[in-house]
A protein has these predicted regions:
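Catalytic-core region of carbohydrate-active enzymes that cleave or remodel glycosidic bonds
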Residues: 263-278, 292-372
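Alpha-helical scaffolding within the catalytic cores
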Residues: 4-9, 33-38, 151, 286-295, ...
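Hydrophobic faces of well-ordered beta-strands that scaffold small-molecule active sites
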Residues: 19-23, 50-52, 90-94, 167-171, ...
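N-terminal carbohydrate-binding accessory modules
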Residues: 1-49
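Short, acidic/polar
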Residues: 28-44, 286-297, 364-371
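Aromatic-lined substrate-binding rim segments of carbohydrate-active enzymes
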Residues: 35-115, 156, 265-272
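Polysaccharide-binding and catalytic clefts of secreted carbohydrate-active enzymes
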Residues: 112-301, 326
Length: 372
């Protein structure tokens, strides 16, 4: 097998344009005895690739105690071997985050419960999610690096360049969403991560590099700021041009730290032996623009895709695909084309965990055809 390749907005396989038709296959949820049969059914249906999360909480149930192959449900290498034997490509998603409706969004409970200082915060310092972690918190990076190096060292022999089935690796999962979804659309304001009040903190450094002087910052924000360390983010609707600039400044600072986070993840994975293209799934059709800086920084072997759901529960705006949904998808895919990558949907629904609203064949077909 060959690692995932693309150019001029198309995927290639063996030198010719090809589609990557991937289905989500969670080895930790499917009985091991059914793996081969399910893979064969997927190939018979036209699939050529499967993607799987590799949940941190399953493989490191206690801090420092790893389990790979101790049980049928955590036999990662057994799954990769079966995929190789069946000729199915694999996209691996080792995290640190997985989501996938797992407890703690796929992070270990010992991490989220045992180290509350890692949790993302509102501007007032309160916690808004029991599994919403502050990406660049030093202690989280220490724990995450150990996990990434452990799992990627195990994955390395299974990369396509070494004769294995793995053709790409995903960095984290739906970045930004773990904060905005649970903080009413706002970001993470963990003081240890962003260094509020610290002249050398991330946020004051960002402002210093952008404005140069407190006077220039005061003029832009249309309010008096005595020093960069004293400059506080705005976390409410802006009522003036200065307020809008203040909101935008924090958004840029926040997204820059996501870019730093991705760069760290990639360096750990590469140093652990993963010679593969890297991908990421923006959390919804409207979020691709948040990743422009990241895509530029990651370079030509980075593929940004998007997640397109029309319904996950009764609280969504629509129960079925709508014209508005189709327009959002079109704009999302055109954004990816403008980035020079194949317009790729990395998650879309083919079933539902809810009895109501049901996903019907007509709805599924309409949803899928909005990507054509």
């Amino acid at each position: 097998m060959q690692a995932l390749e693309w150019k001029d907005g198309l995927f290639y396989r063996d030198g010719s344009p090809a589609l990557m038709i991937s289905g989500e296959f969670h080895y930790f949820r499917v009985p091991k005895g059914d793996w081969r049969d399910r893979l064969r059914k997927w190939k018979a249906a036209g699939g050529n690739t499967v993607a799987t999360y590799i949940p941190w909480l399953i493989h490191e149930p206690a801090e420092g105690e790893y389990s790979f192959g101790e049980h049928d449900y955590d036999d990662l290498e057994g799954f990769l071997r079966t995929c190789l034997e069946e000729g199915v490509q694999v996209v691996v998603r080792p995290g640190p985050y997985q989501y996938s409706e797992l407890r703690y969004s796929g992070l270990p409970g010992w991490l989220c419960e045992g180290y509350p200082q890692l949790l993302a915060r509102r501007l007032d310092g309160s916690v808004f999610g029991k599994s919403s972690i502050s990406y660049m918190h030093p202690l989280f990076l220490e724990k995450a690096e150990k996990w990434i190096r452990k799992v990627c060292g195990l994955l390395a022999p299974w990369c396509a360049g070494r004769g294995g089935p793995i053709v790409a690796v995903q960095l984290d999962n739906e970045a930004v969403g773990i904060h905005t979804w649970f903080n009413d659309g706002w970001y993470d304001y963990n003081p240890d991560t962003f260094g509020f009040g610290n002249p050398d903190g991330r946020w004051p450094r960002f402002l210093r590099e952008k404005y140069g002087t407190a006077e220039a910052l005061s003029e832009a924000w249309e309010c008096r700021v005595d020093s960069f360390a004293d400059a506080a983010p705005l976390c409410q609707k802006a009522e003036s041009r200065g307020g809008i600039r203040r909101l935008r400044d924090y958004e840029q600072c926040y997204l820059a730290q996501v870019s730093d986070y991705f760069a760290l993840l990639r360096s750990w994975m590469t140093e652990s032996g993963l010679d593969l293209p890297y991908i990421h799934n923006s959390p919804n059709p409207d979020a691709n623009g948040d990743f422009f800086e990241i895509a530029d920084r990651m370079g030509p072997r980075f593929l940004l895709g998007s997640d397109h759901y029309y319904n996950l529960n009764q609280n969504w705006k629509q129960n079925n695909p709508t014209p508005q949904y189709a327009v959002r998808n079109f704009i999302s895919l055109e954004t990816l084309r403008n980035l020079g990558v194949p317009p790729t949907v990395l998650e879309m629904p083919s079933g539902s965990a809810s009895d109501w609203p049901p996903i019907l064949p007509e709805d599924a077909r309409a949803a899928y055809e909005t990507r054509l």
